[in-house]
Amino acid sequence: MSEMTHRPLLDVKGLRVAFGGKEVVHGIDFRIAAGEKLALVGESGSGKTVTALALLRLALNADIAGVAKLFDAQAASNGRDLLSIPERELRGIRGKEIAMIFQEPMTALNALYTVGDQIAEVLELHEGLSARDAQAAAVQLLADTGIPEPERRARAFPHQLSGGQRQRAMIAMALACKPRLLLADEPTTALDVTVRAQILDLLADLQRKHGMAVLLITHDLNLVRRFADRVAVMEDGHIVEQGEVATVFEAPQHAYTRKLIDSHPERNVAAVAAGANARPLLEATGLRVSYPVSRPGVAGWFRKGEFIAVQNADFRIAPGETLGVVGESGSGKSTLALAALGLLKYGGALKVDGKGWAVDRGSDLALRRVMQVVFQDPFSSLSPRMTVEQIVGEGLRVHAPELSTEQRRERALAALADVGLSEAQFPSLLDRYPHEFSGGQRQRLAIARALIVDPQLLVLDEPTSALDVTIQKQVLGLLQRLQRERGLSYLLITHDVEVIRAMAHQVIVMKDGAILESGLVERVLDAPEHPYTKKLVAAALLE
């Protein structure tokens, strides 16, 4: 779609948003034509979500200024300024003419009402339908979004649906009144990669069918490239560049746009020095993990059932090697990692540096020094009550109790320097608390905490999924450097095929607790054999 020369559907000029006197959106301008798909792209804190919320005056305690005119189809219309019309008039626009879908449907949907009731409520409010007609229309809307058994799903509560089904229900609710503009705030971020592709295709189909405009809020450039007509790039509350998607991606003008486009992780794996017959650092044969579950009906009173989370998994990791484990939520990959760490009961054989996990604490302590873990979310894996010195040096208190306080401080500073954090950057670094650091810096703290006991193998459980794309690239680069310098081995758990391609030597693909395919990364990702692997690679938008 070419740049608009005629009147748009929505025309935003000089939009400013401030909280408590601090301005976070700085006088931005953009337009959306009827039936157009505009992507607003940027990292966390860029102001893109606040912009969308401000258009409907949903940003709580915000001071909003500027003009956001919504035009009607009639040529004589002067438009309605969403930022100045009375609240009563705006209430008639929200949900009916402009609808919004949110990032996390589990929190956006009301847990106390069925999905059908929540969709029907919109139709009763805006369309004046009777309760019976609204319920029937809700079932049809769910069917239109591709939910199986829509009548049964309409009677379900949000927690009884999968993540993808909840997002489809949210889309059904948003489209109930056939809005002219849909604000989609990170609509696929909380979903698995294959479900993400399905929701994206669904949105595109519904957009074409209803002829509505879409403002897509996202940090995912692959999503923008595949879905949008035009893109506006936000940084620190400013739109730094906008234009047609093909033009911006092929010839970006602003340095920040170029940085975003270049932020995809690059493959830079260290050569594995060990020979084929070298003893692996981690080896599993017939690994099996199961949980007791309640059986339905009267049988559940007398006997528990069994849920198999990991079944007959075989794998090995050589010194200096990275094994990637990729799969969707519920595939068993994190359970496999917990079993490898000796934190779950398991069946089969599992050896760390040639030894199995023992019952007595002393034997396990030696293995825990060999094997450390870095968790997914640095915001929750670091105690907010502990200083950097306490967090990073904690392992030394257990594994090297003979060290003095000063020696522990020196080791902590050395580990922090290894991950790119120094007192030159952060005065009184050891006395600081986690909240004083960004997400990427917190993940560096978590890596330093793992490295301080000089392990041979790190279990990386989704180490970059909570980070922005540019920070993700930096953290992956750090892990690649540490592997080259220290000869570390990694067990890398992720749902991100791009991260596997950048980091791993070998990969195993898991679904429903079973390993469906395994082998060298180049072979598995470039020439997958199993249909599920093909689906996973295609959904990752790497083609």
Predicted features along the sequence, with ranges:
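A short, surface-exposed alpha-helical micro-motif characterized by mixed small hydrophobic
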Residues: 224-226, 500-502
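Conserved ABC ATPase signature
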Residues: 156-161, 165, 428, 432-437, ...
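ABC ATPase NBD Q-loop/coupling interface
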Residues: 69-92, 130, 201, 301-302, ...
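ABC ATPase "signature
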Residues: 239-243, 251, 518-519, 527
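Conserved ABC ATPase "signature" region
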Residues: 133-152, 407-428, 538
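A short, proline-enriched helix->beta-strand linker immediately N-terminal to the Walker B motif
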Residues: 176-180, 452-456
